[in-house]
């Protein structure tokens, strides 16, 4: 159902909003390789389109790889979002089920499918692609706290790192997780140790990931 909605919206937006779909995909031509993107993205930011010039390099790199595997076309971006956006429903359902129950999780999916801004931009805006990493990171954090798992905490850090590589909106997750830990200290100190441990491990993994990228 999600994919059918995305295809329908793409057909409409492809006619009425062609300029929106050109964001990011038009910037692929400015780079010759993945290494070029990693090394020179900041230096070339001023020559990129509005969104690409104010976002991390993840989206352009993803589209660069996609165009090498398939072809250079605006629709490559649309189909990338069409086929990836539905996967957002998986961590969203798991997160809602973990925090509440299966009934609420099902309602969450229904609301997601009929939310106007999500429906209208889900197949032409890269935010639909970014949301997969944001929601997955949130689910992994709560799952790590509940299971008290260091391995899941490391995966949380890696997921946040990947999410930050895609969008600066990931900064909110850090603020949210820190605020949540603070509230836990005030309201439920029995769970404080788990929150602090997961926060430290995931945060450390996040920082280490980018330090390694910088050194390499």
Predicted features by range, described:
Residues 75-99, 136:
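Transmembrane-helix motifs of polytopic, lipid-linked glycan transferases
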Residues 46-71, 163:
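Short hydrophobic/aromatic helix or loop-helix immediately within or flanking a transmembrane segment
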Residues 117, 122-130:
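Short acidic/glycine- and proline-prone juxtamembrane loop motifs at membrane-interface regions
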Residues 108-113, 160:
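Short helix- or helix-capping micro-motifs
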